[in-house]
Amino acid sequence: MALNKKGAKRRRKKVCAFCADKSSSIDYKDVNKLRKYVTERGKILPRRISGNCAKHQRELTLAIKRARNVALLPFTTD
């Protein structure tokens, strides 16, 4: 890998997991998949950390919010 100006390695661009796996859809009822994109404190992971594309990040955010409203996911942890 090439080094940047400060001598640190450049990070490899993450590939969107939903684009790579064409058959997977984002569903608010699939709690196990949604938990991967939520921190232990209950916050939704940003795109630059999760590696999702913009389209799937928007769908993922909507699905997480729906799951929270239906009480499948907690809003926060105790």
UniProtKB/Swiss-Prot annotation:
Keywords from the UniProt entry: Ribonucleoprotein, Ribosomal protein, RNA-binding, rRNA-binding
Homology family: Belongs to the bacterial ribosomal protein bS18 family.
Amino-acid biosynthesis is among the record's keywords: no
Organism: Clostridium novyi (strain NT)
GO CC annotations on file: cytosolic small ribosomal subunit
GO biological process, one term: translation
Subunit record text: Part of the 30S ribosomal subunit. Forms a tight heterodimer with protein bS6.
Protein name: Small ribosomal subunit protein bS18
Entry keyword Ribonucleoprotein: yes
Gene: rpsR
Pfam family, any one: Ribosomal_S18
Function recorded in the entry: Binds as a heterodimer with protein bS6 to the central domain of the 16S rRNA, where it helps stabilize the platform of the 30S subunit.
InterPro entries in the record: Ribosomal_bS18, Ribosomal_bS18_CS, Ribosomal_bS18_sf
One Gene Ontology term of the molecular function aspect: small ribosomal subunit rRNA binding
